[in-house]
């Protein structure tokens, strides 16, 4: 260990405080800290900090972006409800691409389930479905089913490779989970794990924070760290070697995600796009989601906090919100575009500043848990690269068909939790049964008066205000119904199981057939 050399580097960067407890450390602790610090480029970190804080200060004092915003023009927008006559063509295009082994999916799975009250990766979470499948298993089975559908339509076996970006904290447990479950039926060589980078937390004056005497406080560098990670681990080269042309990028916490959605992929390809965003219609002006729009003519996501209430409330002539393209971290990239981002544009991306309460060791060596923000974490966002697209498109889908994020524990505010995720999936599957000609009956044999949401699968323009308003039983809970992704990817192919049949809930349809679970032993 060349400690003097390290001391000099730290001194030049104004970070010499990181060795203030050096003489108190055991030899093993010294080695640990030395290795951690040796791996850091302090000049680069200081530069990141200066730029991030400069941008943060500028945006804090700037007016809102309202005057510079324009909504997504109709010509770059595809809609699952307003473009029904084209859905079949888009789906056929997507399935054709999949059948030629040209499509891969990229999962952003770096998040731990901290807000869910668990210490393991979010993808390993079970929201309490009758099958008790985890998010990872549901997504894996959707990939398997889509491979089968493409094969059925085109007659040749195909593969959808699955690239999974984890963080340092979730990598090992994620890999172990997949190994334990035999990759959920997927071939091991087609599931590629890679790790996003980490950045140290810094105080407001640019000093790297120690969380222990021998340990720097580190945090993942945001889902936009994807691009740096792709470069560091040669992932784009792997995609090229496999002949991949299109990538579907999505976030692990959406239980309804249509992984490698052939309609979305087909739409983007037929539009000649190099980059696309899937969005849901924002119907409530105060919903805290970012919106996809143009600012100064350039596509980007504008966060809810960046626009005034008056702008958020503006409506177009058809009554919809003017800025209604709600971002759901669900994107399409071509591989050449991704390659350009990784090799050319990534260094131009700005870090965003998140002010945080960061536990630290003070100069006396005491561990402090602050009660107000004392520093920043720097992160990039996956959507920051929209600005570099040559042809950007937006695909709007129904929230109740495709978006129910899992962010909070059930004990929290009643939104985006295991119960809402479970209910969203069961409501959707209930619709599928009704649309395929099945019926539900109560314990007396009377048909339940549930009307299917006709909007499912883009069959009507009717959009309901409350996702589950007519799909609940007397206890205001959706009818329990779960259909395995191995049976149906998006509601197709169910007629043989349910047409003209009556079912008691709970109903499960899986590869072993149709099961009506008996409640309370009756």
Curated annotation (Swiss-Prot):
<feature type="binding site">
    <location>
        <position position="290"/>
    </location>
    <ligand>
        <name>UDP-N-acetyl-alpha-D-glucosamine 1</name>
    </ligand>
</feature>
<feature type="binding site">
    <location>
        <position position="304"/>
    </location>
    <ligand>
        <name>UDP-N-acetyl-alpha-D-glucosamine 1</name>
    </ligand>
</feature>
<keyword id="KW-0548">Nucleotidyltransferase</keyword>
<feature type="binding site">
    <location>
        <position position="108"/>
    </location>
    <ligand>
        <name>UDP-N-acetyl-alpha-D-glucosamine 1</name>
    </ligand>
</feature>
<feature type="binding site">
    <location>
        <position position="196"/>
    </location>
    <ligand>
        <name>UDP-N-acetyl-alpha-D-galactosamine 1</name>
    </ligand>
</feature>
<feature type="binding site">
    <location>
        <position position="196"/>
    </location>
    <ligand>
        <name>UDP-N-acetyl-alpha-D-glucosamine 1</name>
    </ligand>
</feature>
<feature type="binding site">
    <location>
        <position position="252"/>
    </location>
    <ligand>
        <name>UDP-N-acetyl-alpha-D-glucosamine 1</name>
    </ligand>
</feature>
<feature type="binding site">
    <location>
        <position position="472"/>
    </location>
    <ligand>
        <name>UDP-N-acetyl-alpha-D-galactosamine 2</name>
    </ligand>
</feature>
<feature type="binding site">
    <location>
        <position position="303"/>
    </location>
    <ligand>
        <name>UDP-N-acetyl-alpha-D-galactosamine 1</name>
    </ligand>
</feature>
<dbReference type="InterPro" id="IPR029044">
    <property type="entry name" value="Nucleotide-diphossugar_trans"/>
</dbReference>
<feature type="binding site">
    <location>
        <position position="303"/>
    </location>
    <ligand>
        <name>UDP-N-acetyl-alpha-D-glucosamine 1</name>
    </ligand>
</feature>
<feature type="binding site">
    <location>
        <position position="223"/>
    </location>
    <ligand>
        <name>UDP-N-acetyl-alpha-D-glucosamine 1</name>
    </ligand>
</feature>
<feature type="binding site">
    <location>
        <position position="407"/>
    </location>
    <ligand>
        <name>UDP-N-acetyl-alpha-D-galactosamine 1</name>
    </ligand>
</feature>
<comment type="similarity">
    <text>Belongs to the UDPGP type 1 family.</text>
</comment>
<feature type="binding site">
    <location>
        <position position="381"/>
    </location>
    <ligand>
        <name>UDP-N-acetyl-alpha-D-glucosamine 1</name>
    </ligand>
</feature>
<protein>
    <recommendedName>
        <fullName>UDP-N-acetylhexosamine pyrophosphorylase</fullName>
        <ecNumber>2.7.4.-</ecNumber>
        <ecNumber>2.7.7.83</ecNumber>
        <ecNumber>2.7.7.23</ecNumber>
    </recommendedName>
</protein>
<dbReference type="InterPro" id="IPR039741">
    <property type="entry name" value="UDP-sugar_pyrophosphorylase"/>
</dbReference>
<feature type="binding site">
    <location>
        <position position="110"/>
    </location>
    <ligand>
        <name>UDP-N-acetyl-alpha-D-glucosamine 1</name>
    </ligand>
</feature>
<dbReference type="GO" id="GO:0005829">
    <property type="term" value="C:cytosol"/>
</dbReference>
<feature type="binding site">
    <location>
        <position position="327"/>
    </location>
    <ligand>
        <name>UDP-N-acetyl-alpha-D-glucosamine 1</name>
    </ligand>
</feature>
<feature type="binding site">
    <location>
        <position position="472"/>
    </location>
    <ligand>
        <name>UDP-N-acetyl-alpha-D-glucosamine 2</name>
    </ligand>
</feature>
<keyword id="KW-0963">Cytoplasm</keyword>
<feature type="binding site">
    <location>
        <position position="222"/>
    </location>
    <ligand>
        <name>UDP-N-acetyl-alpha-D-glucosamine 1</name>
    </ligand>
</feature>
<keyword id="KW-0399">Innate immunity</keyword>
<dbReference type="Pfam" id="PF01704">
    <property type="entry name" value="UDPGP"/>
</dbReference>
<feature type="binding site">
    <location>
        <position position="304"/>
    </location>
    <ligand>
        <name>UDP-N-acetyl-alpha-D-galactosamine 1</name>
    </ligand>
</feature>
<feature type="binding site">
    <location>
        <position position="111"/>
    </location>
    <ligand>
        <name>UDP-N-acetyl-alpha-D-glucosamine 1</name>
    </ligand>
</feature>
<dbReference type="GO" id="GO:0052630">
    <property type="term" value="F:UDP-N-acetylgalactosamine diphosphorylase activity"/>
</dbReference>
<dbReference type="GO" id="GO:0141090">
    <property type="term" value="F:protein serine pyrophosphorylase activity"/>
</dbReference>
<dbReference type="InterPro" id="IPR002618">
    <property type="entry name" value="UDPGP_fam"/>
</dbReference>
<feature type="binding site">
    <location>
        <position position="407"/>
    </location>
    <ligand>
        <name>UDP-N-acetyl-alpha-D-glucosamine 1</name>
    </ligand>
</feature>
<comment type="pathway">
    <text>Nucleotide-sugar biosynthesis; UDP-N-acetyl-alpha-D-glucosamine biosynthesis; UDP-N-acetyl-alpha-D-glucosamine from N-acetyl-alpha-D-glucosamine 1-phosphate: step 1/1.</text>
</comment>
<feature type="binding site">
    <location>
        <position position="223"/>
    </location>
    <ligand>
        <name>UDP-N-acetyl-alpha-D-galactosamine 1</name>
    </ligand>
</feature>
<feature type="binding site">
    <location>
        <position position="108"/>
    </location>
    <ligand>
        <name>UDP-N-acetyl-alpha-D-galactosamine 1</name>
    </ligand>
</feature>
<feature type="binding site">
    <location>
        <position position="251"/>
    </location>
    <ligand>
        <name>UDP-N-acetyl-alpha-D-galactosamine 1</name>
    </ligand>
</feature>
<keyword id="KW-0808">Transferase</keyword>
<feature type="binding site">
    <location>
        <position position="251"/>
    </location>
    <ligand>
        <name>UDP-N-acetyl-alpha-D-glucosamine 1</name>
    </ligand>
</feature>
<dbReference type="GO" id="GO:0003977">
    <property type="term" value="F:UDP-N-acetylglucosamine diphosphorylase activity"/>
</dbReference>
<dbReference type="GO" id="GO:0006048">
    <property type="term" value="P:UDP-N-acetylglucosamine biosynthetic process"/>
</dbReference>
<keyword id="KW-0391">Immunity</keyword>
<feature type="binding site">
    <location>
        <position position="290"/>
    </location>
    <ligand>
        <name>UDP-N-acetyl-alpha-D-galactosamine 1</name>
    </ligand>
</feature>
<comment type="function">
    <text>Catalyzes the last step in biosynthesis of uridine diphosphate-N-acetylglucosamine (UDP-GlcNAc) by converting UTP and glucosamine 1-phosphate (GlcNAc-1-P) to the sugar nucleotide. Also converts UTP and galactosamine 1-phosphate (GalNAc-1-P) into uridine diphosphate-N-acetylgalactosamine (UDP-GalNAc). In addition to its role in metabolism, acts as a regulator of innate immunity in response to virus infection. Regulates innate immunity by catalyzing pyrophosphorylation of IRF3 phosphorylated at 'Ser-386' by TBK1, promoting IRF3 dimerization and activation, leading to type I interferon responses.</text>
</comment>
